[in-house]
């Protein structure tokens, strides 16, 4: 049996309102639990449209057929009008999720984090994280114990900024296996659970067709030599590609794969995890930099 951590990112108002309820129903039908990470502040995701001037982002949008994949309400959110507050508008849905699944913070403002966190000060990072955690805790009525940086925009500064929140783990980067981030000689931070597998929008296109994606990603899960972690998005697998995701759950079960919340991947003694660090890097299919796992001894 292959255990795969299932991470569900919720970036937008529509993803929360429409995608999450469908995902909850789908997961319930198949007896699967996952980790949901919510954006709880304003939905300004439409402001990413300026990135269309960047060839790699434009190609990604064309390759994934973004207009039909996400919908124009998502692609234009927060452009001509102020972004609506996601948490306030969908508190009941978020509370229901937290009743049945591990629930953590994705971002206060997903667009702001993805666009500006790379040059924010530690204090600005801490204030933004605190704002998101405070809002999410007010909604679910219990402490937030985990987080996942929006767009995997994380580096050593983000690791340090999250230390004061006493989280059980963070999932801020791409990598191969769980690790303890090295803060300074002799001091380590909150365990990191990297995402190890590609997302739908990173690979779909000429090389991998939609109808063959599930076969392809299951093969990658079975071949993963580290700790497999797979990310889906409420805006994609919860809406237009919900039937495809349900088919994935069936095929994965038949292949001997068991999905679980990320927290279940943590060992009883996190001190046994190897040391590492998060550095800025790039991966195929995703525009811009993102946090990548690196061995602590690397320069």
UniProtKB/Swiss-Prot annotation:
GO terms for cellular component: membrane. Gene3D superfamilies: Glycoside hydrolase/deacetylase. It catalyses: 4-deoxy-4-formamido-alpha-L-arabinopyranosyl di-trans,octa-cis-undecaprenyl phosphate + H2O = 4-amino-4-deoxy-alpha-L-arabinopyranosyl di-trans,octa-cis-undecaprenyl phosphate + formate. Residues 2-260 form the NodB homology domain. It is an enzyme of class 3 (hydrolase). GO terms for biological process: 4-amino-4-deoxy-alpha-L-arabinopyranosyl undecaprenyl phosphate biosynthetic process; lipid A biosynthetic process; lipopolysaccharide biosynthetic process; response to antibiotic. Pathway: Glycolipid biosynthesis; 4-amino-4-deoxy-alpha-L-arabinose undecaprenyl phosphate biosynthesis; 4-amino-4-deoxy-alpha-L-arabinose undecaprenyl phosphate from UDP-4-deoxy-4-formamido-beta-L-arabinose and undecaprenyl phosphate: step 2/2; Bacterial outer membrane biogenesis; lipopolysaccharide biosynthesis. Keywords: Antibiotic resistance, Hydrolase, Lipid A biosynthesis, Lipid biosynthesis, Lipid metabolism, Lipopolysaccharide biosynthesis. Pfam families: Polysacc_deac_1. Its EC number is 3.5.1.n3. InterPro entries: ArnD, Glyco_hydro/deAcase_b/a-brl, NODB_dom, Polysacc_deacetylase_ArnD. Catalyzes the deformylation of 4-deoxy-4-formamido-L-arabinose-phosphoundecaprenol to 4-amino-4-deoxy-L-arabinose-phosphoundecaprenol. The modified arabinose is attached to lipid A and is required for resistance to polymyxin and cationic antimicrobial peptides. Belongs to the polysaccharide deacetylase family. ArnD deformylase subfamily. This is Probable 4-deoxy-4-formamido-L-arabinose-phosphoundecaprenol deformylase ArnD. It comes from Salmonella typhimurium (strain LT2 / SGSC1412 / ATCC 700720). The lineage of its organism: Bacteria, Pseudomonadati, Pseudomonadota, Gammaproteobacteria, Enterobacterales.
């Amino acid at each position: 049996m292959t255990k795969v951590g299932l991470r569900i990112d919720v970036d937008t108002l529509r993803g929360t309102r429409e995608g999450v309820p469908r995902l909850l129903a789908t997961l319930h039908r198949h007896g699967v639990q996952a980790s949901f990470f919510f954006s709880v502040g304003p939905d300004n995701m439409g402001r990413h449209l300026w990135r269309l001037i960047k060839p790699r982002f434009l190609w990604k949008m064309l390759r994934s057929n973004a207009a039909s994949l996400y919908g124009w309400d998502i692609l234009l959110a927060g452009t001509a009008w102020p972004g609506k507050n996601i948490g306030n508008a969908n508190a009941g849905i978020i509370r229901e999720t937290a009743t049945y699944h591990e629930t953590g913070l994705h971002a206060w403002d997903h667009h702001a984090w993805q666009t500006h966190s790379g040059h924010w000060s530690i204090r600005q990072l801490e204030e933004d994280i605190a704002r998101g955690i405070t809002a999410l805790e007010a909604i679910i009525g219990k402490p937030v114990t985990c987080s996942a940086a929006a767009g995997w925009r994380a580096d050593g500064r983000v690791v340090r900024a999250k230390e004061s929140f006493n989280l059980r783990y963070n999932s801020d980067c791409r990598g191969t296996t769980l690790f303890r981030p090295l803060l300074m000689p002799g001091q380590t931070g909150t365990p990191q659970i990297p995402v190890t597998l590609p997302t739908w929008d990173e690979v779909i296109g000429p090389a991998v067709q939609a109808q063959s994606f599930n076969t392809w990603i299951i093969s990658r899960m079975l071949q993963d030599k580290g700790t497999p972690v797979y990310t889906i998005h409420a805006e994609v697998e919860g809406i237009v590609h919900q039937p495809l995701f349900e088919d994935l759950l069936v095929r994965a079960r038949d292949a001997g794969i068991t999905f679980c919340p990320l927290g279940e991947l943590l060992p009883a003694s996190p001190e046994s995890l190897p040391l590492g660090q998060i550095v800025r890097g790039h991966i195929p299919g995703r525009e811009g930099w993102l946090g990548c796992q690196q061995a602590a001894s690397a320069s």
